[in-house]
Amino acid sequence: MNKEKLRALLAIPAVITVGWGFAVAGNSGRGMDWISSPFACAVLLAFCLQWVAFVPAYLGRTERYFDIVGSATYILATAMLLIRSEGLDTRSVILGLMIFIWALRLGSFLFVRIHKAGKDGRFDVIKNCFVRFLAAWTLQGLWITFTAAAAWTAIASNYKEPFGWYAAIGILIWLVGIAIEVVADRQKSQFKANPENKDKFIRVGLWSLSRHPNYFGEILLWSGVAVIAIPVLQGWQWIVLS
């Protein structure tokens, strides 16, 4: 077994362990019941959906549905939490809408992009290796959990606080973040569509100010989500902000 396969083989249980840790933290350290804990169910769903999608993806040696499955997972897990919530409040609804809007926008953008390109070069090698491809899908489950954990914890929490200044500031941060991400993605798409720019790195618009403004926008919008969630986090749940 080569080093890449060995790393992937070791990474899978490590990633699952970290995901389990997040599930425990989001449940405020009160032990673990995967059925009765909405947050734990969301984490479990995030991983299971990746593993289910991995099977046809590996059999077909395709990565075309990797991003769209990730986006759908955000939506399905968040919807499940909203449905299971014992008392929906304004904070939970807004957090849910933020995730829905972001996931639908980015998921559709990435899906169209990869179908135009025909492939995603990141997967050229690993999609032909069972262990490495499975590790990539498993890591996506953890990434979804990691980014959405603050929102999921707030939605699943029985502890509610009035919708105050934290939430207003968080919404503003989120709006700025998603605006930056949308503009950056559009500018890069327009740049790549010009044959004269083949093999060139974009340095116009927001890309003249930052090497990866789209990533900056995403970091910013998830930071806004975290700010909104902060007032209802308790005990071990603060770990989800890490």
Write out the residue ranges for each language-model feature:
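Hydrophobic, aromatic-rich alpha-helical transmembrane segments
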Residues: 1, 5, 31, 35-39, ...
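Hydrophobic transmembrane alpha-helices
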Residues: 9-30, 46, 50, 74-106, ...
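Loop-to-helix transition at the N-terminal end of transmembrane alpha-helices
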Residues: 33-48, 63-75
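C-terminal ends of transmembrane helices
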Residues: 51-63, 108-115
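Hydrophobic alpha-helical segments and helix pairs
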Residues: 103-151
